[in-house]
């Protein structure tokens, strides 16, 4: 972000560098300011390429071996960037990181913002279908959808953000009927958090993995404190769980921090944390061949961690 800000001094974004420099000390309002800063400084394909590569490198430096990036295609009339160009540029960034020898396997979920409406959602699904066929397995799914059934029919994996706010029971039941391949956040799914036992049963019956983003939930104030986080509920049930960062740069976190937070909050042992990481391979959207390769990597790394 600092690189892009330096390249565009004419933008004069109020308090931009101050917000960026605050890092982990950002307030909720400052996290939302970060979203606005990102949109203002990423208007060209070269901006998208830079930020894609930087994010991948940061994850690689953190020891992450498999990454599913999520990004919403954007068009920018002022620069001529189209949604197709946007996706192509993200894919180019992934390709360049691979060519540079980074020890990380990166895939892409093309995201849809529900607020954009069904027409835009359909366009994005169509774009995702095309890249599913042409990206040599890099595009593996869709994050959210105006009409999620279209996604499933196209062979794309589907991650749905569900129950991020309370009192969404009817909508949640409908969407769980698809069912999605993973649930994002799911903050209010369970009955102890304004959800319902029926919804919990649906999630369990379909063995739908839940993605947990503790730092994001705390900073966005959907969860009051770490010890109240819904990870504890689902983990106690032995339900499939995946620890994630949500928007890494915005919420100033990394995957190591998310694992550390969960371990400290719920008093999990090193062995339990290992199992959590290893089992998450089962829930990625890449092929079985990729899963097998990752399991081999994990098994090679394990002895050094438990000596």
Residue spans for each PLM region:
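Metal-cofactor-binding active-site regions of metalloenzymes
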Residues: 1-156, 164-182, 186-307
